[in-house]
C-alpha cells in the first residue's frame, strides 16, 4: 500500500513539474474601462477590428481602445467629417476592412488615413438613416425606412437598391442573406419580407 502511494506521488510530481498535463489553466489579463478612462456612456455595441482596435459604441459617442488608451469620437456640428450623431447602435467591419457606424442621424464609414468619417448621402444630399446592415459579395447592404441601399466596392458609390412602395412604414431593422440571390428583411412591427435581388420582387 505504501509502495503504491509512493508511486502515485512520484507520478504526480513528474507531471506537475514537466508540463505533461494536456490542459493547463490559461492566464488572462483583464482591464476595466469606465467613465474614468473616458468611456463616453452606456455601451450599446462593441467591435474588434482587423487591426486589433476595440470600438465601443455608446449613447454619447464612439470610443476606440488600443489596449492602452481610449480615444473618443463625438459629433461636432462644424465638422462634416465627424460622426453624424452620438447615439450609436451598431457597427460592422466589411471585407475591405471598412468600419461602418450606424447612428441615430445617419451612417458613417471610418477613414483610417485621416482618422475621420465619410458620411454618405442620398440623391437630395441628406444623411441616410439606416437601421440594419449585412455583407453580401461586392459591397454592403443597408436597411432603412421602406428602402434598401447598396454600397458598391468597385466605384465606392451608394445607391438605392430597393424601395418597398407597398410598405410605407416598413423599417428594415434586420437584414440577412437567405441565399445568394435572396435577402431576408425583418421589421420589428411589420413582419418579414423575402426580396429577390435579381428581379426586385418581394413577398
Predicted segments, located by residue:
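Carboxylate-rich, polar loop motifs that coordinate divalent cations or form catalytic acidic clusters
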Residues: 1-203
Amino acid at each position: 500500500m505504501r509502495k503504491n502511494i509512493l508511486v502515485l506521488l512520484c507520478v504526480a510530481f513528474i507531471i506537475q513539474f514537466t508540463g505533461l498535463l494536456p490542459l493547463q489553466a490559461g492566464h488572462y489579463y483583464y482591464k476595466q474601462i469606465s467613465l474614468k478612462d473616458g468611456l463616453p456612456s452606456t455601451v450599446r455595441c462593441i467591435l474588434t477590428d482587423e487591426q486589433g482596435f476595440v470600438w465601443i459604441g455608446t449613447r454619447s459617442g464612439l470610443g476606440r481602445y488600443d489596449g492602452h488608451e481610449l480615444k473618443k469620437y463625438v459629433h461636432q456640428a462644424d465638422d462634416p467629417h465627424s460622426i453624424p450623431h452620438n447615439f450609436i447602435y451598431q457597427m460592422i467591419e466589411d471585407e475591405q476592412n471598412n468600419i461602418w457606424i450606424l447612428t441615430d442621424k445617419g451612417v458613417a464609414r471610418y477613414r483610417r488615413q485621416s482618422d475621420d468619417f465619410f458620411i454618405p448621402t442620398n440623391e437630395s444630399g441628406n444623411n441616410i438613416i439606416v437601421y440594419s446592415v449585412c455583407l453580401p459579395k461586392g459591397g454592403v447592404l443597408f436597411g432603412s425606412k421602406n428602402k434598401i441601399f447598396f454600397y458598391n466596392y468597385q466605384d465606392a458609390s451608394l445607391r438605392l437598391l430597393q424601395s418597398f412602395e407597398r410598405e410605407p412604414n416598413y423599417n428594415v431593422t434586420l437584414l440577412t442573406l437567405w441565399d445568394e440571390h435572396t435577402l431576408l428583411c425583418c421589421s420589428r412591427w411589420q413582419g418579414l419580407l423575402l426580396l429577390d435581388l435579381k428581379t426586385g420582387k418581394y413577398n
